[in-house]
Amino acid sequence: MGVCGYLFLPWKCLVVVSLRLLFLVPTGVPVRSGDATFPKAMDNVTVRQGESATLRCTIDNRVTRVAWLNRSTILYAGNDKWCLDPRVVLLSNTQTQYSIEIQNVDVYDEGPYTCSVQTDNHPKTSRVHLIVQVSPKIVEISSDISINEGNNISLTCIATGRPEPTVTWRHISPKAVGFVSEDEYLEIQGITREQSGEYECSASNDVAAPVVRRVKVTVNYPPYISEAKGTGVPVGQKGTLQCEASAVPSAEFQWFKDDKRLVEGKKGVKVENRPFLSKLTFFNVSEHDYGNYTCVASNKLGHTNASIMLFGPGAVSEVNNGTSRRAGCIWLLPLLVLHLLLKF
């Protein structure tokens, strides 16, 4: 619907028709727009939604009557306003220019506008097309999603605007490079944990700054232990075993020794669990505490375990000496073989 199309009173509609038939377009005289110099309207006028549009028509002293029309609706005839829309105002009505302004332009104002003049000889018209640009707006976007590793996902981002905006998807991650999709839809087949994080949808059409919204993608996967650190501690000292695991959701930790679970509250022992790390602390190590401990990390998708040693200072020396002895034997083996060959 054009400017004022919904505001006419019945009597004004009748006057509009009469004006057009009687003095703007006399009987038997066709409306023309072929004169290269008179009347002359502007080229196409482009404005953003909410701004004001000025429509100018160049005339001269041959004009006896003049009017601005939106399609078949008269907005102004001379100094008289035939449109009740308060946004439409007369800017100038002189011997050289006839101009109106449409304030707070909206998309329904877009379309053709006609400057129609009457001279002593015949009527003439000139047209200008009003183009209304609209800033981009994201009207629909996927919600945050949680999905198991290996499954497929589809993200949607629908945007409106004039001209039609360009939609792009980008993975917000230090490892991500450039855009992952230049479309409203982002499809990821067999998603991996490295593809988790935030995905940014951007809509742009050069009318205003791009609009941006984000979707958080959580990729669930079973635990894996990235570090299992044993320690050597003398009797009577404090010792700590550490178990670090990566998992989504975060892993739950348990400690075992000889198939027996160690629980919080045991005298002299403390279990400290964090989202990705568990510590087993002995405040006063005894000979009985030495040995092999098992760290178990689990979540709803699976579990894993690792063996961690708590040993005394002497055990470190024995391990190193044992390694050296094995290396020495390997080094001597070729000499023994050569000696036997020469002997026989």
From Swiss-Prot:
<dbReference type="GO" id="GO:0005886">
    <property type="term" value="C:plasma membrane"/>
</dbReference>
<keyword id="KW-0393">Immunoglobulin domain</keyword>
<keyword id="KW-1003">Cell membrane</keyword>
<feature type="domain" description="Ig-like C2-type 3">
    <location>
        <begin position="222"/>
        <end position="309"/>
    </location>
</feature>
<feature type="domain" description="Ig-like C2-type 1">
    <location>
        <begin position="39"/>
        <end position="126"/>
    </location>
</feature>
<keyword id="KW-0449">Lipoprotein</keyword>
<feature type="glycosylation site" description="N-linked (GlcNAc...) asparagine">
    <location>
        <position position="44"/>
    </location>
</feature>
<dbReference type="InterPro" id="IPR003599">
    <property type="entry name" value="Ig_sub"/>
</dbReference>
<dbReference type="Pfam" id="PF13927">
    <property type="entry name" value="Ig_3"/>
</dbReference>
<feature type="disulfide bond">
    <location>
        <begin position="157"/>
        <end position="201"/>
    </location>
</feature>
<dbReference type="Pfam" id="PF07679">
    <property type="entry name" value="I-set"/>
</dbReference>
<feature type="glycosylation site" description="N-linked (GlcNAc...) asparagine">
    <location>
        <position position="284"/>
    </location>
</feature>
<keyword id="KW-0472">Membrane</keyword>
<dbReference type="InterPro" id="IPR013098">
    <property type="entry name" value="Ig_I-set"/>
</dbReference>
<comment type="function">
    <text>Neural cell adhesion molecule.</text>
</comment>
<dbReference type="InterPro" id="IPR013783">
    <property type="entry name" value="Ig-like_fold"/>
</dbReference>
<keyword id="KW-1015">Disulfide bond</keyword>
<dbReference type="InterPro" id="IPR007110">
    <property type="entry name" value="Ig-like_dom"/>
</dbReference>
<feature type="domain" description="Ig-like C2-type 2">
    <location>
        <begin position="136"/>
        <end position="218"/>
    </location>
</feature>
<feature type="signal peptide">
    <location>
        <begin position="1"/>
        <end position="33"/>
    </location>
</feature>
<dbReference type="Pfam" id="PF00047">
    <property type="entry name" value="ig"/>
</dbReference>
<feature type="lipid moiety-binding region" description="GPI-anchor amidated asparagine; alternate">
    <location>
        <position position="321"/>
    </location>
</feature>
<feature type="glycosylation site" description="N-linked (GlcNAc...) asparagine">
    <location>
        <position position="70"/>
    </location>
</feature>
<feature type="propeptide" description="Removed in mature form">
    <location>
        <begin position="322"/>
        <end position="344"/>
    </location>
</feature>
<keyword id="KW-0130">Cell adhesion</keyword>
<dbReference type="InterPro" id="IPR013151">
    <property type="entry name" value="Immunoglobulin_dom"/>
</dbReference>
<feature type="glycosylation site" description="N-linked (GlcNAc...) asparagine; alternate">
    <location>
        <position position="321"/>
    </location>
</feature>
<feature type="glycosylation site" description="N-linked (GlcNAc...) asparagine">
    <location>
        <position position="305"/>
    </location>
</feature>
<keyword id="KW-0732">Signal</keyword>
<dbReference type="GO" id="GO:0007155">
    <property type="term" value="P:cell adhesion"/>
</dbReference>
<dbReference type="InterPro" id="IPR050876">
    <property type="entry name" value="IgLON_domain"/>
</dbReference>
<dbReference type="GO" id="GO:0098552">
    <property type="term" value="C:side of membrane"/>
</dbReference>
<feature type="glycosylation site" description="N-linked (GlcNAc...) asparagine">
    <location>
        <position position="292"/>
    </location>
</feature>
<dbReference type="InterPro" id="IPR003598">
    <property type="entry name" value="Ig_sub2"/>
</dbReference>
<feature type="glycosylation site" description="N-linked (GlcNAc...) asparagine">
    <location>
        <position position="152"/>
    </location>
</feature>
<keyword id="KW-0677">Repeat</keyword>
<comment type="similarity">
    <text>Belongs to the immunoglobulin superfamily. IgLON family.</text>
</comment>
<keyword id="KW-0336">GPI-anchor</keyword>
<feature type="disulfide bond">
    <location>
        <begin position="57"/>
        <end position="115"/>
    </location>
</feature>
<dbReference type="InterPro" id="IPR036179">
    <property type="entry name" value="Ig-like_dom_sf"/>
</dbReference>
<keyword id="KW-0325">Glycoprotein</keyword>
<feature type="disulfide bond">
    <location>
        <begin position="243"/>
        <end position="295"/>
    </location>
</feature>
